[in-house]
Structures are given as structure tokens and as C-alpha cells.
Amino acid sequence: SLAGDGRTYVEMFADSDEMMVLTGVMNLQQHLAAGITTIREHGARNKIGFTLKKGLARGYIAGPRLLASGRPITCTGGHFHMCNEIADGEEQMRRSVRKLVHEGADYIKIMASGGGTEGTIPGLASYTTEELHAAVHEAHHFHRLTAAHCRAKESMVRAIEAGVDLMEHAEFLETDDQLHFDPSIAEMMEESGIWISPTLQSWTHYQGLLS
């Protein structure tokens, strides 16, 4: 949840969990006022997302229906590691999924590549196909879908091979930080039936999209 006051998400992470919950409440109310009835919480620190979900369920706050992933699963030093769900290796991936399901996750978010977090490389895959498959298999066992943050081209291939349900960004980014569209990967995406969320608004101002 962004505060809407011009700060970046890195600056916002300096806030306490309590302040971030209050920011989330404000955002829920704004979405509802705009007529939005369902939104995703797509990776929140600690139990912030689950707290908002419980607040809505108990009628403490008003807002849209909230589908919460909770903490995104990431590798040591990986994108959004500050959310505090670190998993390295197949067994830790399974354990993280079980923990998140127990806490109330509606689906599982996995950081399959680096991103905007300082120290990570967006064009580098964060997990092996086997690690991703372990998380996907465990999530499906508990009737949960999976979403993977994939900026790196290699992370896209691995997510498809692992059976991930939804791919975020799908940037075809190389380790040299250059975009190189690969038709063979696009064909894999089509044949697998994986859902794609290109998140265009993350990189382009909304007015620019309209124009």
C-alpha cells in the first residue's frame, strides 16, 4: 500500500507496521469510493495484509473484497526481502507456503527474479525451476493459486516450466538490463495457458497510456 504522498515504497518501509495498516485502510476506503469491489494485496510485510483482510471480515473497516497473498516468498537478499518471508531450497519453499496458507493467504506470491529492491538484479532469476515447482505443488495441494514476479527472461521460462498460474510483469529482461523479446518464450506462455499481468501502469504514467 502506497501512502500517496510522494514517497517511494523503500521510504515507506521505514514506517511501522501499524502505520502501514492505517495506510492500507485509507487505500481500501479510496478504492471503495471509486467503485472498485475486489482488489489484490500482492505482497505485504509481516502480517499487514492479513490484518487488513481480518478487519474487513469482522466489519471493523469498510472496503472492497480483498484477496491477500501476504508476505511474498523471496530468496536470501531477494526482491522484497524486507517483507520477511525468506526461502532457499525446495523444502523451505514448501514450508513458507504452508505457513502463509495457515495465516490466511488466498494465493501465494513468489519473487522469481530480482526487482526494484536495492541489491537485487532484475534480469537475474532468483529461483530454480525445482524450487518454484515445490512452491507451486504445495500451493495447489492447499487449493491456492500462485503468482510469480518475473522481470528476468530466465525467470519467465522457469515459472512456466514450474506450472505457475499467473506471471507478473513478463519483461523479457536480460542480465545486461536490456529487453529482448523472445518469440519462443511467448509461444511457451501461450501453450502453457499461464495468465499474464503486464502491469503497464507500474512503468508508464496513466495519462501516458490514455494518450
Feature locations, PLM:
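Short helix-capping segments at alpha-helix termini
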Residues: 56-64, 141-143
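Active-site core of metal-dependent hydrolases
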Residues: 76, 117-211
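Active-site gating/metal-coordination segments in enzymes
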Residues: 77-133, 168-172
